[in-house]
Amino acid sequence: MAYLLGIDIGTSGTKTLICDAQGLVKATATAAHPDPSGDGPGWSEQNPEDWWQATIRATHEVCKKAKVKGTAITAVGLSGQMHGLVCLDDAGPDEAAALRPAILWNDQRTVAECEDLEKAAGSRARLIEMTGNPALTGFTAPKILWVRKNEPDVFERTRHVLLPKDYIRYRMTGVYATEVGDASGTSLLDVKARGWNRELIGKLGLDASLLPECFESHQVSGKLTDHAATKLGLEANTPVVGGSGDQPAGAVGNGIVTAGLVSATMGTSGVVFAHAA
């Protein structure tokens, strides 16, 4: 029998789930992360390596609980905490140590950079028109601007920026990729065109090559490398789909896909989702 593996990179831990092709859940598992920390007021950071090690532990644990061999997993889907910033150089996926701790979704250091972002766009209204959102301190683009301004040595060495779950995707597949759900929370996506907003990226003076390829959530973004498969106890070349950020994925799972439906999620954060016609 074929099984599917879901991996969610949360704030407090990484959660895994195995289900069959009909969606029947066989088992779940969780591996905890160290609590977020930071050296400044309002800072919230984690070490991306901790996410990867938790992914390894939780994957082995869920296979054990489900009594499913890793070779029976036919596809992997990813979700995770949104908006975070992981800075990488060109080191390969087998190591892929981040250049600095990841700046998380609940980090509040970027008030000035949010102002810079709106100025670059032309106005708050224009930024909303371009990306679907105003500048928010938790979003990714202000974090990139903060690193450029305050840690120029790190920024100069940065060749790729990834969201948390997409760092795990890179460790699994060697592919720099994201998908439209998570990318919509970066302040850099043209949500109507479903691709990076090249105009805004240019106005910010950023190199578009920093950003990963953007897939749809259902598309295959890459396949497990031999190294990752060995670490995870899975089969090499297993496809990994785009997935989504944790909140959009949860909303779809709750059936918030038609007008008039609303969901509320209370976790490390509180989020209300409504379908917009």
Segment roles from a protein language model:
Residues 1-98, 129, 157, 212-213, ...:
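N-terminal glycine/serine-rich phosphate-binding loop of ATP-dependent small-molecule kinases
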Residues 14-18, 84-88, 187, 249-252, ...:
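Short beta-strand scaffold segments in enzyme catalytic cores
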Residues 27-30, 34, 112, 217-231, ...:
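Acidic-glycine-rich active-site phosphate/pyrophosphate-binding loop
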Residues 93-109:
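A charged helix-plus-loop insertion that forms the helical arch/lid used to bind
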Residues 9-11, 22, 102, 108, ...:
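Gly/Ser/Thr-rich active-site cleft segment
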Residues 86-90, 172-176, 181, 224-227, ...:
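Short acidic, glycine/serine/threonine-rich loops at helix termini
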Residues 230, 234, 238-277:
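Catalytic phosphate/nucleotide-handling subdomain of diverse soluble enzymes
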